[in-house]
């Protein structure tokens, strides 16, 4: 608790692609869980008993449901360092096999183990330790009422070691010559390390199921992608890679230096459960988002779901508005490697029409549907894209703001097509916005901006011009899309008798960047992006790939009686604030 604010943890039940409303009330006593326990160096819930050794590594995980041990006898699930990590050709991109063939060293400096949480919903052990100049903090957690079959290991690492590879090792009490690796769309089975394939990619999970299929261990992670399998019973996840190099790319000797936050999790299961691994991996990587809202009746009730699949064989990867505004686009795929027939994706309203599309939302043919359900059939790991049009809801809620455009006297051509980018430029580098990316209208935060026409005057270059605000009604907010041309600027906007200052970043470049120790400083723009282009035009280079372009959203109060604004802008709208 901090002042009049408190952090609380509770078990929530939320439907797929939906929300649930909970209210918080003071209670006379503290809720207790009979399942959660945290005696010395031990965690226990209704599913697992987890024991740490004196070094803070996980020496035992007992699955009480199946009566199985997850950790190989005499071993531990742990982080380990591999010292001597040379690479002189492509240090950031390669790891040498001789590095990984060395025995890993434990991280055992200055070990401190304490209880961080012991509540009715979650119990957590905190492990602090060091390796040379690098500092490690781990939080090992079990829950009661949440994802209780998942053991989370959250990590914060302040890393400054050199010539070292850091991995998490999982020597399991199950063994198999092959493991299943998540590819994002499906999975692949791979064997143990070879001379040429010893560091392989996976997305959110890797599963090792015993050769007899009786029991398995799934390792989840939220941001790491390199794995290896040195033995039938061992998985390893690459965490940090700081190579030594005497020749090329010498600055990469400090690769990965800095503070890192990552989580890996352990799930035990009976049988071969790759579809459960998919669900668990998604749950770790897309946790519930909680926020506080004022009490109100609302239109949709205390719970709502935008869609739900009838079987875990169908994974929904995206639900979005169609690019042309006509209906919704659903992207899904078959998850298990077995064809599926007649699966259903159900929506909250009746489907009026449905069609199968390709990846760029072009029609392929009609799709089957019944009532509120889209009928899906797919081959092994096959991706599918559908467009669905839903019946109008009885109650429509909108985030749109009632806005009106401000008339501008355009005096510069900022958006060009491929045929004209050599004729019109906006900066000394001879660049321009790529018109093929700019729609007729841009919507941001519920405000719609009407964009100018390409290859003609379509923007205003600041020169102290005064622009009249709409006079048909009283407006309370001014919304502006603006960018700086040659360098970031502090711009002045005079709205009526009130003056505002706004930081306007450059129209191109990077919005943010990690810092590289001893080489560059990290940064992130503070302005809100109103429009983002994935490439731009430049006279000598043509279409510049990954040459991002931006227009930033600025918002100002309109004082009572204001009729004009003097500003630097590309386009603007005056609007009521709802």
Question: Where would I find each of the regions flagged by the language model?
Answer:
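C-terminal (or distal) subdomains of carbohydrate-active enzymes
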Residues: 1-400
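N-terminal/edge-of-domain interface segments
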Residues: 394-573, 578
């Amino acid at each position: 608790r901090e002042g009049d604010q408190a952090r609380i943890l509770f078990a929530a039940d939320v439907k797929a692609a939906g929300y649930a409303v909970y209210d918080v009330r003071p209670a006379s006593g503290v809720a207790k869980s009979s399942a959660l326990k945290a005696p010395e160096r031990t965690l226990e819930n209704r599913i697992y008993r987890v024991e740490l050794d004196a070094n803070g590594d996980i020496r035992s995980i007992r699955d009480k449901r199946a009566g199985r041990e997850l950790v190989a006898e005499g071993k531990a699930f742990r982080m380990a360092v591999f010292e001597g990590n040379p690479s002189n050709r492509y240090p950031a991109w390669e790891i040498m096999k001789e590095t990984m063939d060395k025995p890993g060293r434990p991280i055992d400096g200055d070990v401190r183990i304490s209880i961080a949480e012991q509540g009715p919903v979650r119990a957590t052990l905190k492990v602090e330790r060091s390796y040379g100049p690098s500092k490690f903090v781990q939080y090992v957690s079990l829950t009661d009422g949440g994802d209780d079959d998942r053991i989370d290991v959250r990590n914060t690492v302040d890393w400054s070691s050199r010539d070292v590879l850091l991995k998490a090792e999982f020597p399991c009490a199950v063994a198999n010559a092959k493991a299943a690796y998540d590819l994002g769309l499906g999975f692949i089975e791979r064997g143990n390390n070879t001379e040429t394939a010893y560091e392989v990619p996976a997305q959110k999970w890797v599963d090792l199921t015993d050769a007899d299929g009786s029991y398995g261990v799934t390792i989840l992670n939220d941001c790491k992608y390199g794995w290896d399998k040195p033995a039938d019973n061992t998985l390893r996840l690459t965490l940090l890679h700081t190579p030594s190099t005497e020749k090329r790319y010498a600055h990469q000797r400090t690769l990965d230096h800095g503070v890192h936050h990552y989580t890996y999790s352990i799930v035990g299961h009976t049988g071969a459960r790759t579809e459960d691994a998919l669900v668990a991996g998604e749950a770790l990587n897309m946790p519930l988002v909680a926020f506080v809202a004022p009490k109100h009746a609302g239109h949709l009730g205390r719970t709502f779901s935008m869609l739900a699949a009838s079987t875990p064989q169908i994974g929904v990867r995206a639900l979005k508005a169609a690019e042309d505004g006509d209906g919704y686009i659903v992207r899904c795929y078959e998850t298990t490697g077995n064809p599926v027939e007649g699966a259903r994706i159900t929506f909250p309203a009746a489907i009026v029409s449905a069609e199968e599309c390709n990846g760029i939302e072009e029609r392929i043919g009609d799709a089957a549907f019944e009532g509120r359900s889209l009928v899906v059939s797919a081959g092994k790991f096959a991706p599918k894209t559908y467009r669905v049009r839903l019946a109008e809801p009885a109650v429509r809620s909108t985030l749109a703001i009632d806005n009106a455009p401000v008339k501008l006297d355009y005096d510069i051509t900022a958006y060009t097509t491929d045929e004209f980018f050599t004729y019109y430029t906006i900066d000394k580098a001879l660049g321009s916005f790529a018109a093929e990316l700019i729609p007729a209208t841009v919507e941001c935060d519920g405000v719609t901006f009407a964009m100018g026409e390409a290859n003609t005057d379509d923007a205003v270059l600041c020169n102290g011009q005064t622009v009249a605000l709409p006079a048909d009604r009283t407006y309370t907010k001014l919304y502006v899309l603006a960018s700086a041309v040659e360098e970031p600027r502090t711009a002045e906007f005079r709205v009526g008798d009130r003056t505002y200052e706004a930081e306007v970043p450059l129209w191109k470049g990077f919005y943010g960047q990690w810092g590289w120790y001893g080489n560059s400083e990290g940064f992130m723009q503070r302005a809100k992006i109103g429009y983002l282009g994935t490439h731009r035009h430049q006279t000598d280079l043509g279409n510049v790939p990954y040459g991002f372009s931006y227009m930033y959203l600025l918002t100002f109060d309109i004082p009572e009686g204001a009729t004009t604004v003097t500003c630097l802008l590309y386009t603007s709208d005056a609007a009521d604030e709802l």
